[in-house]
């Protein structure tokens, strides 16, 4: 292990994922997962060399408390003084950032201005930055924007059909998210296929509690499903995805809800959870559906049908498709979701080999389409932490 370690922080609305990455080897020295940080049941789990230890965050139910506990763990293992820089995943960087950036006060001001665009994520991201600055004074902090990868989209893909004045005044456009994941997965898929990335018309489906799909042509994002905020597009764990905007006015007029209540419902109570009335967790729903739970069955049907429609539409952006790639927690592990989705797409020449689909789970990457089939279908586990660490080291001048 070298003395050039990068701390990567990924603060969600109620979670904290942390990883200490060795700059030289790219290996994970220590990782942590803080969960339910906004509740009295907050806990943080540390993983060092495969040994896990869970600690309650009693009285520290916030991101700052979780970072403080992480600091204690680093000191316990003699890692604190080896940390040379800190990288942060930032959900929404607005129009300004097309690449990662060293964080100063001007950047913090921009991130605060983007809070209305990602109200669930940016406040948590900012909390993580402030906590890191407090606990690691003097170290450089780097922001890696989830939106930056999609700044290459053509105007026809990112423009909303609303008056120009509104678009300009409020920077009202499609931004896209999961860009850090796409930056890692796309070249990995190209490596597996043995072809230059620039020669592959690729569609990547990042499927987790949040989910999006991106069309990549000539190695660049040309279209994506998430939009002005992360709610647009696919059916997600608790987010509705695409929905008629008229729902807002209808519910405020007829259901006695205000805009904030509708927004909370569409972000936190919809998606798989809303349809199934059971869970936002795909694993739970797959088991329940097999046992005859109608809500779970319908939720998975709606999810996979919507996903297949988006895959077909992204082929327009690419001008065809050479490879479909699944990533993210669901994409990497759920053979049933992959198989059901691809079953809708045989008209595009997409097929799945049942044996390969069964094998490519739990961290295993590779091709899951038949050997004589084209386009290819792949599974590629993402590694956003490594991408963030690489950007952080480069901008912080850590060679």
Swiss-Prot record:
GO terms for biological process: acetate metabolic process; acetyl-CoA biosynthetic process. Its main location: cytoplasm. ATP binds at residues 17, 206-210, 281-283, 329-333. It catalyses: acetate + ATP = acetyl phosphate + ADP. It is found in: Cytoplasm. It comes from Neisseria meningitidis serogroup B (strain ATCC BAA-335 / MC58). This is Acetate kinase 2. Mg(2+) binds at residues 10, 384. The gene is ackA2. GO terms for cellular component: cytosol. Its EC number is 2.7.2.1.
